[in-house]
Design a protein with these regions (language model features):
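ABC ATPase nucleotide-binding domains
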Residues: 239-254
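Conserved ABC transporter NBD signature motif
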Residues: 60-68, 77
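A short, flexible loop at the N-terminus of ABC-type nucleotide-binding domains that lies
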Residues: 1-7, 11-23, 71-73, 91
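Helix-to-loop junction immediately C-terminal to a conserved catalytic motif
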Residues: 52
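Catalytic Walker B motif of ABC-type/P-loop ATPase nucleotide-binding domains
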Residues: 164-168
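The feature captures the beta-strand-to-loop junction immediately N-terminal to the Walker
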Residues: 37-39
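Conserved ABC ATPase signature
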Residues: 139-143
Length: 254
């Protein structure tokens, strides 16, 4: 087992408030789908913002691919880690192809950007792997919610094939598109070996599509284990402060 992300003794607090994370230790396995699970306010979104260098932590160590996070420039980090946030602004009158090409924009001279041959190859690769080739000339504001989510995943894929973080990727989708997106995530992981980190609110999705789950409660990891070891009513009830029932391998009430 090789860990692609190692977090040791991490402390983080907002302004002068009490620490959200204190001596947090997390390891994320390379090439696996790992889901962060827990109720609102437990630290899931904060953790991915730290990994993206959108928030600075107070102390401790965060290593990605063996290198300290603070040693990465934003451009270097973007080449190995991409994030699809829960809420994204959708521009009007722009094609799917142009939208995905934005992922290849450098951090300088963006107004003079012209795709290189390598950029074009990665854009076409991302469109192919997300089944968007037939839509590449279509305007993004004409797409369904599920198709649009594929565009955002394609953008992440065009940016990085090392680590992709998905923040609630199915929240605003109906059941049909939820299953389609989760199957796409699994296919990308299995076919390309991409390390995928997800934040999910749906426990059944986490149990069905994750290799590993990290359970966070009040800024602490209470369990980091294979998903198959999370079919535990006592654990889930503690995690969500709810009356959760599991039947035939699924959460049926909570």
């Amino acid at each position: 087992m090789e860990n692609i992300i190692e977090i040791n003794n991490l402390t983080f607090k907002y302004d002068n408030k009490n620490a959200l994370f204190e001596d947090l230790n997390v390891s994320i396995e390379k090439g696996k789908i790992t889901t962060l699970l827990g109720k609102n306010g437990c630290g899931k979104s904060t953790l991915i913002k730290i990994l993206a260098k959108n928030l600075n932590y107070n102390s401790g160590s965060v290593k990605i691919e063996g290198k300290e996070l603070n040693s990465y420039s934003l451009k270097e980090l973007a080449s190995i880690l991409a994030i699809v946030y829960q809420k994204n602004e959708t521009p009007r009158e722009i094609t799917v192809y142009d939208m995905v090409s934005f992922a290849r924009l450098p951090y300088q001279n963006i107004f003079f950007y012209k795709p290189t041959a390598s950029d074009v190859e990665k854009i076409e690769f991302a469109l192919e792997k997300t089944n968007l080739q037939a839509y590449k000339d279509k305007r993004v504001d004409e797409l369904s919610g599920g198709q649009l989510q594929r565009v955002y995943i394609a953008m992440a894929l065009a940016q990085s094939t090392d680590i992709i973080i998905l923040d609630e990727p199915t929240t605003f989708l109906d059941i049909k598109y939820q299953k389609s997106i989760m199957q796409l995530v699994r296919d990308l992981n299995k076919s390309l070996g991409i390390t995928i980190i997800m934040v999910l609110h749906d426990i059944n999705q986490a149990l069905a599509y994750s290799d590993n789950i990290i359970a966070l409660l009040d800024g602490k990891v209470i369990k980091n284990d294979q998903a198959s070891n999370f079919f535990d009513e006592t654990l889930l009830n503690r995690l969500y402060d709810a009356d959760i029932k599991i039947e035939d391998g699924k959460v049926i009430s909570w």
